[in-house]
């Protein structure tokens, strides 16, 4: 079988580079593809044409582009689409994504369906995120609202830059709205997961979206840095250090760990068994890899029983072949990462304060080392001191700390929380939760942290990121 060669894409035109990087199978080391490599100079040179990307998209109305998104969703899910010097079926897409990322096939398919769902429902999503604003106002830059008020929105950038991760194909839903908003895309794919951006690009093109609105720059780290430097608005995905680095930079939206949590209120905690399925799903879904997975369950009592019940459910889970429909955990493909995380957890254990409850249900070690990859088996900690560092930590596998903490101290102790599910009917506490600025997405009721409604903003509203609301007048105001 010949190895697929995948070019750099410069405003829709393939570009072959002398520098190439191999993308290999995580278990066998077999070369799956050769990626032509961009460099920072190339990105800098192409940035001068960024305004043309928006011009190309503005040939079509937002409504027409939403329809093209719907068509692209179907093509992405079902069609054989071009990939470099070959083509790729949906089955081949899932297979190669699994082979290079270590993600089980069932999770690759689930992520594929999630991306397609967002594309299919793009009209509803944009209607919700714009609060019903007529989309032609975004295209034209100004217009009359239904209440007969002149409003103006100015695009903050002609293109959205993305520095994408290698280990989480689910994040691609966040940049898909750019195209129907007539904003071009400058994508730096993850080194082992270029498959989603390239397939999405081909699906958009097959649906009639102008190719010249998109750049794809596989390459080393300096390419990502240059994308962030040259684009007026960008997103980057990484760890806490990445989030800290770009904190306060209005040009960059940094997505990092979620520290998502379930908080059990005193009014309902005695019925914790009723919510066990919600807790388990929140921890284990998608291999526990996402910022939307639950990494902390907080309650004032019953925490030892809760931790034990979750540990019984997820502790026995073992690594399975990626093709097994029951596979529930993903491989760590970068040497040393899993071992370092496992050592860190062990170092955090403290008799009577931090206990690994899964140890007795695991029947083996947490760390499973294989020839070319490692696995971490699900881990549940019971933490009796809410100030201990292990009460608020997160790892890229099914890991959760069940923390004992009085309800009246929870909001001051949980720290930054991307998704907070509060299982309570206490109206006074619900008001406090609504007011808590350290919770981004708030769920009230037994809703898994990973059950996202895409009609809601995620880590900020992309409309507010890509457009600036400003004053506009083309006639004298009343009373002048």
Explain the meaning of each model-derived region.
Residues 131-280, 457-459:
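Rossmann-like NAD(P) dinucleotide-binding subdomain of oxidoreductase/dehydrogenase enzymes
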Residues 25-35, 62-77, 189, 209-211, ...:
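Conserved C-terminal structural/oligomerization subdomain of aldehyde/semialdehyde dehydrogenase
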Residues 13-15, 39, 166-167, 191-192, ...:
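Short, glycine-/Ser/Thr-/acidic-enriched flexible segments
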Residues 1-146:
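N-terminal Rossmann-like NAD(P)+-binding subdomain of aldehyde/semialdehyde dehydrogenases
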Residues 215-218, 255-256, 321-331, 425, ...:
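A generic structural motif
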Residues 45, 49, 60-71, 199, ...:
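A non-catalytic, amphipathic alpha-helix used as a structural packing/dimerization or gating element
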Residues 203-206, 231-233, 239-385:
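ALDH superfamily catalytic-core signature
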Residues 13-18, 155-156, 168-171, 373-375:
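Short, flexible loop/turn motifs enriched in small residues
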């Amino acid at each position: 079988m010949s190895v697929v060669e995948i070019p750099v894409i410069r405003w829709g035109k393939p570009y072959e580079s002398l520098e190439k990087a191999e993308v290999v199978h995580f278990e066998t080391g077999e070369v799956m593809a050769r990626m032509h490599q961009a460099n920072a100079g190339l990105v800098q040179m192409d940035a001068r044409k960024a305004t043309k990307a928006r011009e190309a998209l503005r040939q079509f109305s937002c409504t027409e582009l939403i329809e093209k998104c719907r068509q692209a969703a179907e093509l992405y899910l079902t069609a054989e689409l071009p990939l470099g010097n070959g083509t790729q079926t949906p089955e081949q897409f899932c297979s190669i994504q699994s082979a290079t990322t270590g993600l089980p096939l069932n999770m690759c398919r689930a992520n594929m369906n999630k991306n397609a769902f967002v594309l299919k429902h793009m009209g509803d999503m944009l209607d919700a995120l714009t609060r019903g604003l007529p989309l032609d106002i975004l295209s034209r830059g100004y217009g009359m609202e239904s209440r007969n008020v002149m409003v103006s929105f100015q695009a903050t950038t002609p293109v959205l830059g993305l520095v994408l991760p290698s280990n989480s194909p689910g994040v691609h839903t966040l940049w898909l709205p750019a195209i129907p908003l007539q904003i071009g895309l400058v994508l730096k794919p993850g080194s082992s997961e270029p498959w989603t951006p390239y397939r999405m690009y081909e699906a958009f093109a097959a649906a009639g979206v102008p190719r010249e609105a998109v750049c794809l720059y596989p390459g080393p780290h300096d390419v990502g840095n240059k994308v962030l430097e040259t684009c007026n608005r960008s997103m980057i995905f990484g760890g806490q250090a990445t989030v800290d680095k770009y904190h306060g930079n209005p040009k960059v939206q940094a997505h990092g760990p979620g520290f998502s949590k379930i908080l059990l209120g005193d009014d309902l905690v005695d019925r914790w068994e009723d919510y066990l399925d919600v807790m388990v799903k929140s921890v284990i879904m998608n291999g526990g890899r996402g910022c939307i997975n639950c990494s902390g369950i907080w309650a004032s009592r019953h925490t030892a029983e809760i931790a034990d019940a979750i540990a019984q459910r997820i502790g026995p889970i073992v690594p399975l072949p990626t093709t097994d429909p029951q596979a529930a955990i993903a491989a760590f493909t970068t040497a040393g990462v899993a071992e370092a995380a496992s050592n860190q957890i062990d170092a955090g254990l403290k008799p009577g304060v931090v206990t690994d409850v899964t140890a007795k249900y695991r029947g083996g070690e947490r760390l499973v080392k294989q020839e070319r990859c490692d696995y971490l088996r699900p881990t549940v900690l019971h933490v009796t001191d809410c100030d201990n560092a292990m009460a608020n930590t997160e790892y890229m596998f099914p890991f959760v700390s069940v923390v004992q903490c009085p309800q009246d101290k929870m909001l001051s102790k949980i720290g930054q929380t991307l998704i907070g599910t509060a299982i309570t009917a206490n109206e006074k506490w619900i008001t406090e939760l609504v007011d808590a600025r350290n919770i981004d997405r708030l769920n009230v009721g037994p809703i898994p942290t990973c059950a996202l409604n895409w009609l809601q903003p995620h880590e900020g509203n992309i409309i507010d990121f890509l457009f600036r609301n400003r004053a506009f007048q083309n006639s004298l105001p009343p009373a002048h």
